Swiss-Prot record:
Binding site for CTP: 42, 45, 130, 150, 159
Lineage of the species this protein comes from: Archaea, Thermoproteota, Thermoprotei, Sulfolobales, Sulfolobaceae
Source organism of this protein record: Sulfurisphaera tokodaii (strain DSM 16993 / JCM 10545 / NBRC 100140 / 7)
Task of the protein: Catalyzes the addition and repair of the essential 3'-terminal CCA sequence in tRNAs without using a nucleic acid template. Adds these three nucleotides in the order of C, C, and A to the tRNA nucleotide-73, using CTP and ATP as substrates and producing inorganic pyrophosphate. tRNA 3'-terminal CCA addition is required both for tRNA processing and repair. Also involved in tRNA surveillance by mediating tandem CCA addition to generate a CCACCA at the 3' terminus of unstable tRNAs. While stable tRNAs receive only 3'-terminal CCA, unstable tRNAs are marked with CCACCA and rapidly degraded.
Reaction(s) catalysed by this chain's protein: a tRNA precursor + 2 CTP + ATP = a tRNA with a 3' CCA end + 3 diphosphate; a tRNA with a 3' CCA end + 2 CTP + ATP = a tRNA with a 3' CCACCA end + 3 diphosphate
Pfam families noted in UniProt: CAA_C, NTP_transf_2, tRNA_NucTransf2
Cofactor list: Mg(2+)
Keywords: ATP-binding, Magnesium, Metal-binding, Nucleotide-binding, Nucleotidyltransferase, RNA repair, RNA-binding, Transferase, tRNA processing
Origin: domain of life: Archaea
Note: A single active site specifically recognizes both ATP and CTP and is responsible for their addition.
Gene Ontology MF terms in the entry: ATP binding; CCA tRNA nucleotidyltransferase activity; magnesium ion binding; tRNA binding
Protein name: CCA-adding enzyme
Gene name, Swiss-Prot/TrEMBL: cca
Subunit details: Homodimer.
Residues annotated as binding Mg(2+): 54, 56, 107
Length: 413
């Protein structure tokens, strides 16, 4: 049995798995009698993975009611159908419901009924056209190839178009298989990717500026892969190259890292978001904080080895790895050459000024802030939040911290 056959055996749902989800979905559909409601997403397309226990049901309203109706009245109407069930309100471009039936999570999403993908007013409006396109272009073998590619992307950490991941959506994964024909062919081509990569199932109707460009076949004005970052594309390309040379289950099911040696000084910024907010909104702010802190800490003279973040919409950890947290209290401040117009300002603003052998002015300056002070002054979220700082002083069992310390993905070596 090949690795791909073994993986497929583990990830392909059985008839019993499918029937279980279909029965739960029918409970919701029965509650939506009178509405134009349909199952969408990977379950409908037959590309879902064993263990996935969520289903998308879209409820389509006339286009004439507009986006504001979806945000306000549509949600209230839908809630009336599920008051006696366990549900919660979630948020994307507009609110939707997550209804729990036993252990199955069912997203009930209001959308507008349109004639073509190009008429979409909200992102959800295109979904049925995505579903129809994929179903019409994939047979049973093609659906299995999608499953393999999904599991591969999950294993190397680049599956998901959300801001937290900045990776490949399920739809883009399906389009890659439709374009190249098989899992192995996708990897063979991905191993040669050089950005910008263009994969055109349809001629685009506008120019795109992204590492990966996949015009949406149902709306060619849209780049379906706009979420994919350069890092995610690079990870996919390198993982594809290495897998083709030396296949391993580690690409699909990576082993958890053991305890790692602490190299340098590690500061953990543990953030607690006190308000319920859309995960994409939180993670947009997380990555902006990461970039800002890296810049400010480096500017203060600390050498940053690495900085990253992990967590969810409520609990986030920002890991900062420094060569050393102990650096001099004073530092050399390099000024302008003696003949430049801002020499006078430099002299007035600094003490201990001298002229160097190179004709530049120099001074000695006291460092203004420690790393902790930089974080205290600059960490920010629009939502109410609290945080605590922890210097890592001993090895721990936390898999995310150990992954941050190890750096190297298990499939890379």
């Amino acid at each position: 049995m090949t690795i791909e056959e073994e993986v497929l055996k583990r990830i392909k749902p059985s008839k019993e798995d499918e029937e279980k989800l279909r029965e739960r979905a029918q409970i919701i559909l029965d509650r939506l009698k009178g509405y134009n409601a349909e199952i969408e997403g990977s379950f409908r397309k037959g590309t879902w993975l064993k263990g996935d226990t969520d289903i998308d049901i879209f409820v389509f309203f006339p286009k004439s009611v507009g986006k504001e109706y979806l945000r306000e009245k549509a949600l209230k109407e839908l809630i009336e159908r599920f008051r006696d069930l366990n549900y919660k309100i979630a948020y994307a471009e507009h609110p939707y419901l997550i209804v729990y039936v036993d252990d199955v999570e069912i997203d009930v999403v209001p959308a507008l009924s349109i004639e073509s993908g190009e008429e979409a007013i909200t992102a959800a409006d295109r979904t049925p056209f995505h579903t129809k396109y994929v179903i019409s272009h994939l047979d049973e073998k093609g659906r299995d190839e999608v499953r393999l590619l999904k599991r591969f992307l999950k294993g190397i950490g680049v599956y998901g178009a959300e801001i937290k991941v900045k990776g490949f959506s399920g739809y883009v994964t399906e389009l890659l298989i439709i374009y190249y024909g098989s899992f192995k062919e996708v990897l063979r081509n991905a191993s040669k990717f050089r950005p910008p990569v263009r994969i055109e199932l349809v001629r685009p109707k506008k120019e795109f500026d992204s590492p990966l460009i996949v015009p949406d076949p149902v709306d060619p004005k849209r780049n379906a892969s706009s979420a994919v970052s350069l890092k995610s594309l690079a990870t996919f390309a390198l993982a594809s190259k290495i897998y083709l040379e030396k296949p391993s289950m580690e690409f699909f099911f990576p082993s958890k890292p053991g305890r790692q040696t602490i190299k340098g000084d590690i500061l953990l910024v543990k953030v607690k978001i006190e308000e319920s907010t859309v995960e994409d909104i939180i993670w947009g702010q997380v990555w902006r904080n990461v970039e800002k802190l890296k810049t400010l800490i480096s500017h203060e003279g600390y050498r940053v080895i690495d900085i990253s973040a992990w967590g969810d919409a409520e609990n986030i950890t920002i890991g900062i790895q420094l060569e050393s947290k102990s650096i001099g209290e004073y530092y050399l401040n390099v000024g302008p050459y003696f003949y430049l117009h801002n020499v006078k300002n430099f002299i007035e603003e600094n003490e201990n000024v001298w002229i160097g052998e190179d004709g530049r002015l120099y001074s000695i300056k006291r460092r203004r802030y420690t790393v902790e002070e930089i974080i205290k002054r600059n960490l920010s979220f629009k939502q109410k939040f609290t945080y605590e700082l922890q210097w890592l002083t001993e090895e721990v069992d936390d898999p995310w911290i150990n992954l941050f310390l190890r750096k190297t993905p298990s499939w890379l070596k």
